[in-house]
């Protein structure tokens, strides 16, 4: 029986989840909800179903896999990853997974706050000033490893890819000083399942955010 992934018809928080579902060759279908245009940004497609799905904390994205009904994007990633042993094996690897899972979410949220803010034009230059340091931390954490945790890919590589790619779209030159991050992105995009997905009609690279956002809403 196929899993169902529910989310807005955007990239957003579902990008890493979709990539992981494809990489693991999981059987799934998507339930995509459309938000209305300004000024109302009608969300009735989702709100009409929100409390009817049996979710403990009704929100998007959600994943329904038989009796398992999961919200929170990282919880969904962890659930899929545990099925395929993509959570790290040693204690050291699991520590690195935990650190990067939270760091990637922090940085992703920081960018989203800027992109959704009415003060976007004021906040963007300030964010760009901090960007090299953010990327340097990712670069140092990766080091000479092929994947962020070590020799084997884990689910946090999908989060890291998402956040690095988002920033590459936001500021195309932001990775130029960090060849190991550029190599990581190429390595990730070169994975057979990922490459095939990115060439398919299912792939949804944009819009990055919902229509409420000031930047990345198209």
From Swiss-Prot:
One record GO biological process: glutathione metabolic process
Subcellular location: Cytoplasm
Binding annotation for substrate: 116
Record domain GST C-terminal: where: 90-208
Record-annotated GST N-terminal domain positions: 2-88
Tissue distribution of the protein: Expressed in a wide variety of tissues.
Signal peptide limits: none
EC number, UniProt record: 2.5.1.18, 4.4.1.20
Membrane-spanning residues: none
Key words of the record: Cytoplasm, Lipid metabolism, Lyase, Transferase
Keyword Lyase: yes
Catalytic activity from the UniProt record: RX + glutathione = an S-substituted glutathione + a halide anion + H(+); 1-chloro-2,4-dinitrobenzene + glutathione = 2,4-dinitrophenyl-S-glutathione + chloride + H(+); (13S,14S)-epoxy-(4Z,7Z,9E,11E,16Z,19Z)-docosahexaenoate + glutathione = (13R)-S-glutathionyl-(14S)-hydroxy-(4Z,7Z,9E,11E,16Z,19Z)-docosahexaenoate; leukotriene C4 = leukotriene A4 + glutathione
PANTHER family associated with the record: GLUTATHIONE S-TRANSFERASE, GLUTATHIONE S-TRANSFERASE MU 4
Family affiliation: Belongs to the GST superfamily. Mu family.
Subunit structure: Homodimer.
Function: Conjugation of reduced glutathione to a wide number of exogenous and endogenous hydrophobic electrophiles. Catalyzes the conjugation of leukotriene A4 with reduced glutathione (GSH) to form leukotriene C4. Can also catalyze the transfer of a glutathionyl group from glutathione (GSH) to 13(S),14(S)-epoxy-docosahexaenoic acid to form maresin conjugate in tissue regeneration 1 (MCTR1), a bioactive lipid mediator that possess potent anti-inflammatory and proresolving actions.
Name of this chain's protein: Glutathione S-transferase Mu 4
Organism classification: Eukaryota, Metazoa, Chordata, Craniata, Vertebrata
Gene: GSTM4
